[in-house]
Amino acid sequence: MTWKLASRALQKATVENLESYQPLMEMVNQVTESPGKDDPYPYVVIGDQSSTPFETKSSFGENITMDFHVWGGTTRAEAQDISSRVLEALTYKPLMFEGFTFVAKKLVLAQVITDTDGVTKHGIIKVRFTINNN
């Protein structure tokens, strides 16, 4: 069996779900991997990923934890509402990608903090996806 990493395919599928979910896109200016210094709030950033093996006797897969960062304005409610829309976007339709089989997803963390500037609200979401190689 050939092993391959699912992280890039998973990231592409999650971005497609986020960008196609109208209730989210009505609330944010963009979904991006690397926002510009002067990009206006609010927006969603696809953050770090980590992967650990998920193996059985007959298959190889991964548990991939992905971070999603919500950069809101000055209210906690806005960051919470956008964070909720991110979770809705990840679950409103199946994640579609070739070469892998989606097994499960689990919310690991959802929190809103005040950024180091003392004003901006920052939502942090961690979701664990279990993916098998085909």
From Swiss-Prot:
Q: What is its main location?
A: virion
One example of a Gene Ontology biological process annotation? virus tail fiber assembly
**Which Gene3D superfamilies does this entry report, sorted A to Z?**
3.30.2000.30
Q: Which InterPro entries match?
A: Gp17-like, Viral_Tail_Comp_sf
Task: Give a Gene Ontology cellular component term annotated to this protein.
Answer: virus tail
Please provide the record's keywords in A-Z order: Viral release from host cell, Viral tail assembly, Viral tail protein, Virion
Localisation per UniProt entry: Virion
Task: Please describe what this protein does.
Answer: Tail completion protein that caps the tail and interacts with the connector gp16, thereby attaching the tail to the capsid.
Kindly state the subunit structure of this protein.
Answer: Homohexamer. Interacts with gp16 connector protein.
Name of the protein described by the UniProt record: Tail completion protein gp17
